[in-house]
């Protein structure tokens, strides 16, 4: 888990800084199948964070159709197509004008994106909580091909990979690594609750695994893959229920709870425009990238701009929540 192995991520950061732009498939941590030279700094960080987060990934392979991840069992998942790599990076995910953003928000099916696009929006670890304008929901964009390859494409397959742990004495079913991460979260919070009993009512599990669609959508919920847990929904609402453009709890929700989850690879739905304040989702690749970028910034750089071939790409820059501020702010959350 990230919170328990800081040296692991420090080593990853050092390796990123030393990794040359022209690395080949054979030299970049076992990637094979063709040249991976010329990738942006962000793509290199994404691929390294994916491999560090998921031991099921055996290799990264490139070919005329794009870049693929090869998983155990010879399964392959597309990281990014050749067309996506050749176009302005992440055009399909975030760099959209106001009308396009609104159309995308009203078409949630299009939030099933490539792995590359799913990792682009920067997730900011607590205590930092940026504004969440329309279009800013880091981690709510998902690659369902990747989730199905990791956990199963149907309920029966996912169930076979479930384990059971507990949070504050309540049993929770989650998938493999997520169940181990939740057990570590429970360990972190046990002492916090002992010292601050007022936290306990916020930590009532409303369930982990449940094969179902997202409320109001046709996409599968991450609960379907056993990687999400909801806590105390009566206290921490979902945007469709609250019908508020922004919710005060997005800023005031207890940081000790959020930090305990983030330290073990979970992201919090309170950092989304379409906020889900009860929702914690196991996405270790996103938290790994968040910590790498934070280390780059605190080391004296400015995130991706501190790496060779960094943020500026084909006339565009890496999006940040601050870049998106004010976009669509007048729209209500009715999608």
What is each model feature region?
Residues 11-21:
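Bacterial N-terminal signal peptides
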Residues 21-33:
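Bacterial Sec-dependent signal peptides at the C-terminal "C-region" and cleavage site
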Residues 3, 24-25, 223:
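Residue-level detector of bioactive/disordered segments in secreted/extracellular proteins
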């Amino acid at each position: 888990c990230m919170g328990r192995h800081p040296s692991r991520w420090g080593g990853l950061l050092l390796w990123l800084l030393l990794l040359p732009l022209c690395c080949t498939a054979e030299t970049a941590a076992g990637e094979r199948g063709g040249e991976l030279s010329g990738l942006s700094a962000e793509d290199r960080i994404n691929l390294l964070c994916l491999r560090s987060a998921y031991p099921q990934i055996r290799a990264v392979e490139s070919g005329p159709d794009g870049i693929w991840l090869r998983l155990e069992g010879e399964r392959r998942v597309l990281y990014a197509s050749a067309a996506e790599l050749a176009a302005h990076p992440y055009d399909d995910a975030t760099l959209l004008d106001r009308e396009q953003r609104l159309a995308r928000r009203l078409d949630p099916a299009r939030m099933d994106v490539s792995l590359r696009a799913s990792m682009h929006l920067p997730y900011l670890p607590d205590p930092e909580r940026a504004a969440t304008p329309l279009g800013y929901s880091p981690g709510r964009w998902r690659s369902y091909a990747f989730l199905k390859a990791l956990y199963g494409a149907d309920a029966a397959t996912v169930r076979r990979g479930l384990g059971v742990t507990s949070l504050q004495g309540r049993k929770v079913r989650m998938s493999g690594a997520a169940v181990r991460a939740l057990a570590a979260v429970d360990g972190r919070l046990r002492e916090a609750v002992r010292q601050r009993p007022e936290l306990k009512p916020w930590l009532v599990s409303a369930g982990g695994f449940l094969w179902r669609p997202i409320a109001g959508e046709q996409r599968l919920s991450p609960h379907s893959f056993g990687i999400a847990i909801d806590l105390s929904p009566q206290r921490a609402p979902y945007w469709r229920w609250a019908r508020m453009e922004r919710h005060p709890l997005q800023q005031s929700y207890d940081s000790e709870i959020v930090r305990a989850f983030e330290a073990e690879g979970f992201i919090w739905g309170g950092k989304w425009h379409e906020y889900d304040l009860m929702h914690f989702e196991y996405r270790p690749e996103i938290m790994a990238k968040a910590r790498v970028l934070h280390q780059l910034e605190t080391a004296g750089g400015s995130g991706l701009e501190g790496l060779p071939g960094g943020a500026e790409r084909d006339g565009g820059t890496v999006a940040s929540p601050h870049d998106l501020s004010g976009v669509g702010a007048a729209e209500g959350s009715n999608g």
